[in-house]
Amino acid sequence: MLAALLVCAMVALTRAANGDTGKEAVMTGSSGKNLTECPTDWKMFNGRCFLFNPLQLHWAHAQISCMKDGANLASIHSLEEYAFVKELTTAGLIPAWIGGSDCHVSTYWFWMDSTSMDFTDWCAAQPDFTLTECCIQINVGVGKCWNDTPCTHLHASVCAKPATVIPEVTPPSIM
């Protein structure tokens, strides 16, 4: 009990010292003492931080914008993660860029963060492998599915990066 209180106090003091009380933090790890957090305005899901950017940008400019925050356009790895991302984009009402592309090798889709493309939610007849359509737009049509579209279109975007792990601090033993 005392250890839990000390950890909570340490977290509160760290946040106050950083002047950043708007961060989203989650206890993780087998000991329950590790803390991961996201910057202010970012939202956490499965150990990653996501940010919806409503600015209408070309895909490459959206990626550059993410990189300025140490992130990439989001990769999506499960239906649950996609549901979370859709909620970030005003419940799926706003078309947005994510980090998938086949611009380098047509028909070979990859994520900008170099993770495997182990989940997709393409709309019917997509991707259609049109050479000028090599970036992924989400929230298309009634099904809110994915479409390969020209990278020069203007859309909002979703960035993602790993959550920051705050090192576990072992409080001094009290004798």
UniProtKB/Swiss-Prot annotation:
Pfam families per the UniProt record, alphabetical: Lectin_C
Keywords, sorted A to Z: Antifreeze protein, Disulfide bond, Lectin, Secreted, Signal
SUPFAM superfamilies: C-type lectin-like
SMART domains membership: CLECT
UniProt signal peptide: 1-16
Propiece span(s): 17-33
Record InterPro entries: AntifreezeII, C-type_lectin-like, C-type_lectin-like/link_sf, C-type_lectin/snaclec_domain, C-type_lectin_CS, CTDL_fold
Cell compartments where the protein resides: Secreted
Membrane found in the keyword field: no
Primary site of residence: secreted
Paired cysteines (S-S): C38-C49, C66-C159, C103-C134, C123-C145, C135-C151
UniProt domain C-type lectin: residue ranges: 36-163
Molecular function terms, GO-annotated: carbohydrate binding
Recorded GO CC terms: extracellular region
Protein task: Antifreeze proteins lower the blood freezing point.
Name of this chain's protein: Type-2 ice-structuring protein
Organism (species): Osmerus mordax (Rainbow smelt)
